[in-house]
Amino acid sequence: MKKCRFLVLLLLAFVGLAACSSQKSSTDSSSSKLNVVATNSIIADITKNIAGDKINLHSIVPVGQDPHKYEPLPEDVKKTSKADLIFYNGINLETGGNAWFTKLVENAQKKENKDYYAVSEGVDVIYLEGQNEKGKEDPHAWLNLENGIIYAQNIAKRLIEKDPDNKATYEKNLKAYIEKLTALDKEAKEKFNNIPEEKKMIVTSEGCPKYFSKAYNVPSAYIWEINTEEEGTPDQIKSLVEKLRKTKVPSLFVESSVDDRPMKTVSKDTNIPIYAKIFTDSIAEKGEDGDSYYSMMKYNLDKISEGLAK
């Protein structure tokens, strides 16, 4: 009986040691990976497409929230402090307005171009209307798929610098991702070439589609220019309504991350319907249409071209 009890205890001890060993192995594997932080869901998704499971990834601004003006949570501060690599958009997105990202990296004692990098480096910057100076840049460069490719290339470059052992994986994933984005970009240009010129205008709440407009030859109009200024004032709405009454624009669009009430007022005053919500500052929730950078852009391109072709 004693011998039997001893064997049972020995077996339990062995199982416990095996479990601890397995847990330790899993922990060691996770801790050996790069700790990477991205400021928003779009940058995080591009990073994930290149890095796969080779990194530990944290995205700061939650899906559906505005990256222009965010208040980091304690978890964001902790992850940023421990990060080996931090990706931010740049072009005055996270550093404009309340400058939340500037404060975050300063408090974490992180250094630019050593610990954190702008993924927009190399993009042909577009400025806010009537402006051409630092601090007046339009940050929404990712809405041009060619810029999305630049983002991906910059992310891959920094991952390889920090983690050369996984260079082959990063380069392979980058190549496949670029091919995917390039094909969608070509498809988009063909779609918008077939829309009559008098219908060709994308109307949104925020004036975020400038890069989109330039890439796909679709003029844009908006209620307010950028989310760090007043949003949806009576004068802003009146100005857009007067502009639209002189056009044959068939559809309006409203972004997923803004209050839709100002655009509903524009729709009522012009009798132009809101065709769809589109994604500009964030991807969609997991499992929904637009829950990755690629699917977000495809969704936008499909909805906008459909709405303007009506």
From Swiss-Prot:
Induction entry: Induced at low concentrations of extracellular Mn(2+) and by the addition of Zn(2+).
GO cellular component: plasma membrane
Domain of life according to the entry: Bacteria
Entries under InterPro entries matching the protein: AdhesinB, Bact_metal-bind_prot9, Lipoprotein_PsaA-like, ZnuA-like
Lineage of producing organism: Bacteria, Bacillati, Bacillota, Bacilli, Lactobacillales
Subcellular location per the Swiss-Prot or TrEMBL entry: Cell membrane
The protein's assembly and partners: The complex is composed of two ATP-binding proteins (ScaC), two transmembrane proteins (ScaB) and a solute-binding protein (ScaA).
One Gene Ontology MF term: metal ion binding
Lipidation sites (S-diacylglycerol cysteine): C20
Name of the molecule in the record: Manganese ABC transporter substrate-binding lipoprotein scaA
Topological type in the membrane: Lipid-anchor
Pfam families on file: ZnuA
Summary of the function given for this chain in its UniProt record: Part of ATP-binding cassette (ABC) transport system ScaABC involved in manganese import. Essential for growth under Mn(2+)-limiting conditions. Also acts as an adhesin which is involved on adherence to extracellular matrix. It is an important factor in pathogenesis and infection.
Presence of the UniProt keyword Transport in the record: yes
NCBIfam families, alphabetized: ABC_lipo_SloC
Keyword terms: Cell membrane, Lipoprotein, Manganese, Membrane, Metal-binding, Palmitate, Signal, Transport
Residue sites binding Mn(2+) per the record: H68, H140, E206, D281
Family: Belongs to the bacterial solute-binding protein 9 family. Lipoprotein receptor antigen (Lrai) subfamily.
GO biological process: cell adhesion; metal ion transport
